[in-house]
Amino acid sequence: GIDTWGVDFGLIDKHGNLLGNPVCYRDARTEGMPAEVFKCMDEHRHYAETGIQVMPINTLFQLYSMKQNQDAQLEVARQLLFMPDLFSYFLTGVANNEYCIASTSELLNAKSRNWSFDTIHSLGLPEHLFGKIILPGTIRGTLKEDIARETGLGAVDVIAVGSHDTASAVTAVPAAESPIAFLSSGTWSLLGIEVDEPILTEEARKAQFTNEGGVDGKIRFLQNITGLW
């Protein structure tokens, strides 16, 4: 299984080829994009659907920047794969989107745990980019024959873990018996709790809380705060 940081992605074409290297979320292309996006939709309603804190780095704003700049990759792309989805695709040839990593995009409906097609349509993004959502624990596929042969591993299954690194970190917290708060530190520090349902109130939006997907049907209700970068 593979986990990585959130929001970043690669685009593959109809032949299954990667269309250029993924762009880091710290690239300046998303500057000013939230203001542009919320000319197309209501920010309050958007949070009530996605439950995600508005941050310029999020996938939504990366894609809208590409659209605004008429990026040729967006015109010919067949599917979007987040970083762990992309590496799993390289290993198996199977393209799908794991739930936890997809939830970081600001393009997922927090209640249905499927794509927010209202958001996608409002921004004029190609619907076909957004593939099947799979849950942690799903078998993505088996190693490609050439990789299995080169590594000597044979037909090993590749599993969809909690593919956002924080989702896997929180799952490993040894505190199953009682409610706990967690602090996961790295590039960012993520301070929060696990809940069964997203918290989509106006108070949560104003306080800049985010609802990210977790393992075993949980929601990670948290804040992004200062980390090590």
List each model region and its residues.
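Gly/Ser/Thr-rich active-site cleft segment
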Residues: H46-T166
